[in-house]
Amino acid sequence: GPAACLHTHPPYATSISCEQDLIVLKPIDEEGKKNLGNIVIVEPDEDNQDEYLRQLAEALKQGNMKAVVVKGHGVFSTGSNFDEAWRWASVIEHSMRVLMHARQANLRV
């Protein structure tokens, strides 16, 4: 299994994850599409920590994901070491920044 798990609070991924009824994030940039595909969004459940952790683990297992986003909170990313986990967190944030800028420019995405 992974040797590193990183938790970050990136502003773009966190902001976009707050969209109502959104269950996955879909990168529009080529790096995000190629390396990430769809990114699962997990609903936070502070009242039931065991269920919350189970959902995080299950989301990471889906499609062999390298990272998941907790709605309105942040990113959990995994890797064989810290650098790899950091790379996945960085790719997600870059992709969500591109998406946010495209939306602000009213580009069709």
PLM region spans:
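Glycine-rich flexible loops
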Residues: 1-109
